[in-house]
Every structure is written in C-alpha cells, then in structure tokens.
Amino acid sequence: MSDSTEHVDQPEPRWQVILAVVAIGGIYLALPPWFTVGPTWLLPALIVVLLIPTVVTHRMGRHSLNHALGIVINAIITLALIGSVILLVGAIPVHKQAPLSLLLSGAELWLTNVLVFALWYWRLDGGGPTVRDRRREFGSRSFVFPQMQIEKIERGRFSVERWRPNFVDYLFIAFTTSSTFGPTDAPLLARWAKALTMCQIFISLSIVVLLISRAVGIL
C-alpha cells in the first residue's frame, strides 16, 4: 500500500493534536502572572480536565460529544489567549515590565496563537476529523492545499492521488498566516475559515507591531 493510500484510508493521528494542546498549557504556565487571566494554573488545569474526557469519548466512539468537547477546549484556550494579549498590550505603554520579559511573553503568545488556530482549522474543516475519516475524500472542503491544485492525471506522479490533510498541514497554514499576516500555502474556501484567519492575523499583528514598537522605543 502506498503512502498516499495510507494517508487517506487510515484515521488521522490524534497524538499531534494532544501534544499541541498540552504545549499550550505549558506555554501558559511559563507566562508571567501579570499576563494571565486568573491564576497561572487555571488554564492548564482546565485543559487537563477537559482533555481526558475528550480522549475517552474518542476511544468510545462518542463522536458528537468528542467534537463538542474539542470545541469547548478550543474556545477556552482562545479566550485565554485574547485575554493575555490584551494584558500584554496594556503593559507595553506603561513600561512597567522589563523589555526582555515583554519580548519573551510576546513570543510565547505568538506561538500560542499559531497552535490555537491550527486546532480550530483541524477541528472544523469538513465537519471535523471524525467526519473526514468517514468520508475518506481527497483533499479538503475548506482550504485549497497545493496537492489539490495538481492535475488529476499528474497526482500519481507525486503520490497524492488519495491525499488529505492532517494536523501538521493545518499547523503549517496557521504558522504561515501568523508569519506573513495572510494565507500563503492554501487559499481559503469556507467563510468560517476566512473569519478565523482574520482573527488570527489581527492577534499576530497586534503582538508583532507592539513588540517591535516597544523594542525600538517608539512607545
């Protein structure tokens, strides 16, 4: 069996997503307390409490509940990220925090922004990973990945005739979006993807512009 066939016929690996969620909790623990909403341990604790039943429901085949729990986790992390970015923005003009602390915190929040929206894209594209596993369709319904732009008769040459994305592909979209302030690898098809991308770009732009301004002493 070819790699492309395995990519479409096997369920998407979930360990990558679990690792991303755990990484977000770890990043939040590393933030200074003045850049966190509530106690520093609160978000990581919520992640653990919700992640366990999310994994269990997936194993038990409770796909609707699993999808709902995944949405809740993403929503909580997103709200925490927005709250931390607001606190970061508020701390820059007053010059109360050390420049190095601000830069490190900004970098951590920028990375969190990438991971959070990668989770959203993975969770929502085509109805979610479980629905995508059932359909076993080529490509994506929300993004135009480069593999989808290859002519059908040429797909075998590049071993992508039965290709579909997994979490790493969504992570790359999120990374390039935050880095270039716009989608570069895969054009957007779905309106929800466009809305989320605008939110991601706004957050990334806020972090980068304000930190650069602080670094050069403009503010």
Where are these regions (language model features)?
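Cytoplasmic-side transmembrane-helix entry/capping segments in multi-pass membrane proteins
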Residues: L65-I77
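Pore domain of cation channels
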Residues: R164-L219
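N-terminal membrane topogenic signal
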Residues: T5-A20
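C-terminal ends of transmembrane helices
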Residues: S4, T54-S64
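Structural signature of hydrophobic alpha-helical transmembrane segments
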Residues: Q16, V37-L50
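Short, hydrophobic transmembrane alpha-helix segments
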Residues: Y28-W41, R59-G61
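Membrane-proximal soluble regions of multi-pass membrane proteins
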Residues: G126-D185
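Pore-domain transmembrane helices of cation channels
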Residues: I92-T130, R135
